[in-house]
Amino acid sequence: MSQLREIQEEITRHEQQLVIARQKLKEAERTVEVDPDDVNKSTLQSRRSAVSTLEDKLAEFKRQLADVISRQKMDEKPVDPTGIELDDHLKERSSLQYGNVLDVNSIDIEEPSGQTADWLKIGSYIIEFALPIILKALHMLSTRGRQTVKENKGTRIRFKDDSSYEDVNGIRRPKHLYVSMPTAQSTMKAEELTPGRFRTIVCGLFPAQIMARNIISPVMGVIGFAFFVKDWADKVKAFLDQKCPFLKAEPRPGQPAGEAEFLSSIRAYLMNRQAVLDETHLPDIDALVELAASGDPTLPDSLENPHAAWVFACAPDRCPPTCIYIAGMAELGAFFAILQDMRNTIMASKTVGTAEEKLKKKSAFYQSYLRRTQSMGIQLDQRIILMYMIEWGNEVVNHFHLGDDMDPELRQLAQALIDQKVKEISNQEPLKI
């Protein structure tokens, strides 16, 4: 009964606040009609926001009130001796007990979770900001990503920096960068920034700046990304000049020297792949690339670009839209995703536990990357990923950070010293280092 009274009091209080807020909104509207300057417009916007927030809270309290009243009515109803709820369609009692009631009022099925992001709007929003706040936010959502998401889950956070501001009648006002931190039940709007979308768009727009500041996500750091991208341009050139296992060009009489070799190279295979990608362009992504090309962003134009691989330095969960139509780029991201799965499989294999516990430690970065990237309108060429793995797989795996770099002899000696000291001071069994 006390809960019902508390909700009723909250409804009364919010209704009073709403009346006052609506009066202030009317006053602000009249002020803007008389003097429509930026300060008055800003005040009007904040008044509208306050009214909207109060209306939402009031509606939520009314829903809670209805739920409490409904629950009380259900409690007052006589219990059916069969144990079946009154509105259950079963004729006989189920072997399962009744569980929680899941309230789906807040879910908007017009904008389902997992929908394709509006990359043009997201990119346009990001490009408006100064580079320092973008890179600092990227650092917080990649290098410190896990902690940032954990501390702010279920909220819409604002990044603030002195480099990001706007002038309103000569008054400097902070310009915040908004990012939503969804929970598993959250529904995201197409133009709404989440940590995954933020990393994706920023990595695609500013790879040269990310390379210059050496911003690398921990999940990329542990697979040896910094080692792998060293001398990237030379590494890719050598790769592209190699013979492609999927092309066979027979020399023809009178053919110029080296033409047959070129036509059977990996470079020729990627040129064919580029021709296929050129036919799959989406207008929104083309518009985003044009918008980015006219400003500060540093989009890679080919796989051989020195900062091309840095598009994936912060582990975006899909290929960034700004380079999705460059042959080999989407596949390079898939290659990195496979490497992450390979490292996690190695780590799971060496841990102690049951087979089921080890399986839980495996990851599915590749499947997630594949699904998200293909939702943007392209199919990945698995042959290119295979060629990457043949060429670089062994080299990268040998540079994985597996968290166990202690020399076996050093470990054995250290353990012997631990065992000896523990026996001297106690009768307990010494732990393993």
Curated annotation (Swiss-Prot):
<dbReference type="InterPro" id="IPR002214">
    <property type="entry name" value="Hanta_nucleocap"/>
</dbReference>
<keyword id="KW-0255">Endonuclease</keyword>
<keyword id="KW-1040">Host Golgi apparatus</keyword>
<keyword id="KW-0167">Capsid protein</keyword>
<keyword id="KW-0946">Virion</keyword>
<feature type="region of interest" description="RdRP binding">
    <location>
        <begin position="1"/>
        <end position="50"/>
    </location>
</feature>
<comment type="similarity">
    <text>Belongs to the hantavirus nucleocapsid protein family.</text>
</comment>
<feature type="region of interest" description="Homomultimerization">
    <location>
        <begin position="377"/>
        <end position="425"/>
    </location>
</feature>
<comment type="function">
    <text>Encapsidates the genome protecting it from nucleases. The encapsidated genomic RNA is termed the nucleocapsid (NC) and serves as template for transcription and replication. The nucleocapsid has a left-handed helical structure. As a trimer, specifically binds and acts as a chaperone to unwind the panhandle structure formed by the viral RNA (vRNA) termini. Involved in the transcription and replication initiation of vRNA by mediating primer annealing. Plays a role in cap snatching by sequestering capped RNAs in P bodies for use by the viral RdRp during transcription initiation.</text>
</comment>
<dbReference type="GO" id="GO:0019029">
    <property type="term" value="C:helical viral capsid"/>
</dbReference>
<keyword id="KW-0143">Chaperone</keyword>
<feature type="region of interest" description="Homomultimerization">
    <location>
        <begin position="100"/>
        <end position="125"/>
    </location>
</feature>
<feature type="region of interest" description="Interaction with glycoprotein N">
    <location>
        <begin position="80"/>
        <end position="248"/>
    </location>
</feature>
<feature type="region of interest" description="Interaction with host DAXX">
    <location>
        <begin position="377"/>
        <end position="433"/>
    </location>
</feature>
<keyword id="KW-1139">Helical capsid protein</keyword>
<feature type="short sequence motif" description="YxxL">
    <location>
        <begin position="178"/>
        <end position="181"/>
    </location>
</feature>
<dbReference type="GO" id="GO:0004519">
    <property type="term" value="F:endonuclease activity"/>
</dbReference>
<dbReference type="GO" id="GO:0003723">
    <property type="term" value="F:RNA binding"/>
</dbReference>
<feature type="region of interest" description="Chaperone activity">
    <location>
        <begin position="1"/>
        <end position="100"/>
    </location>
</feature>
<feature type="region of interest" description="Homomultimerization">
    <location>
        <begin position="1"/>
        <end position="79"/>
    </location>
</feature>
<keyword id="KW-1035">Host cytoplasm</keyword>
<keyword id="KW-0543">Viral nucleoprotein</keyword>
<dbReference type="Pfam" id="PF00846">
    <property type="entry name" value="Hanta_nucleocap"/>
</dbReference>
<feature type="region of interest" description="Viral panhandle binding">
    <location>
        <begin position="1"/>
        <end position="175"/>
    </location>
</feature>
<keyword id="KW-0540">Nuclease</keyword>
<feature type="site" description="Important for the endonuclease activity">
    <location>
        <position position="103"/>
    </location>
</feature>
<protein>
    <recommendedName>
        <fullName>Nucleoprotein</fullName>
        <ecNumber>3.1.-.-</ecNumber>
    </recommendedName>
</protein>
<dbReference type="GO" id="GO:0019013">
    <property type="term" value="C:viral nucleocapsid"/>
</dbReference>
<dbReference type="GO" id="GO:0044220">
    <property type="term" value="C:host cell perinuclear region of cytoplasm"/>
</dbReference>
<keyword id="KW-0378">Hydrolase</keyword>
<feature type="region of interest" description="Interaction with host RPS19">
    <location>
        <begin position="150"/>
        <end position="175"/>
    </location>
</feature>
<feature type="site" description="Important for the endonuclease activity">
    <location>
        <position position="88"/>
    </location>
</feature>
<comment type="subunit">
    <text>Homotrimer. Homomultimer. Homomultimerizes and binds to viral genomic RNA to form the nucleocapsid. Interacts with host MAP1LC3B; this interaction participates to the protection of Gn from virus-triggered autophagy. Interacts with host SNAP29; this interaction participates to the protection of glycoprotein N from virus-triggered autophagy. Interacts (via N-terminus) with host RPS19; this interaction probably mediates the loading of the 40S ribosomal subunit on viral capped mRNA during N-mediated translation initiation. Interacts with the viral RdRp. Interacts with host SUMO1 (via N-terminus).</text>
</comment>
<keyword id="KW-0175">Coiled coil</keyword>
<feature type="region of interest" description="Viral RNA-binding">
    <location>
        <begin position="175"/>
        <end position="217"/>
    </location>
</feature>
<feature type="region of interest" description="Interaction with host UBE2I/UBC9">
    <location>
        <begin position="188"/>
        <end position="191"/>
    </location>
</feature>
<keyword id="KW-0694">RNA-binding</keyword>
<dbReference type="GO" id="GO:1990904">
    <property type="term" value="C:ribonucleoprotein complex"/>
</dbReference>
<feature type="coiled-coil region">
    <location>
        <begin position="4"/>
        <end position="71"/>
    </location>
</feature>
<dbReference type="GO" id="GO:0044177">
    <property type="term" value="C:host cell Golgi apparatus"/>
</dbReference>
<keyword id="KW-0687">Ribonucleoprotein</keyword>
